């Protein structure tokens, strides 16, 4: 979720959205960035949590997933937060992303799309 830019755009477009971030500071920044009035009926939900543990979302419930996971241990997004995959080396990061992909597949409606924005790890 980072600073909530995708959630802000969803709100402006009248879309419902769920933002999840493991870092409480990112959650707080996103909440602040979403404190504006907009003449739409969108519902924006923000939650501190792990993208590999989406137990609070029903199976086949989400229409579109847009995710921008960290780049393994290239950029540290937090200090000492359990489950933060930005703290992991490449091999462990890929293993953790497998769990994220499984949960994304579970919550995504059949025939819908998931966009994963990530850099190539080939040259790392």
Describe the predicted segments one by one.
Residues 1-122:
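Class I S-adenosyl-L-methionine-dependent methyltransferase catalytic core
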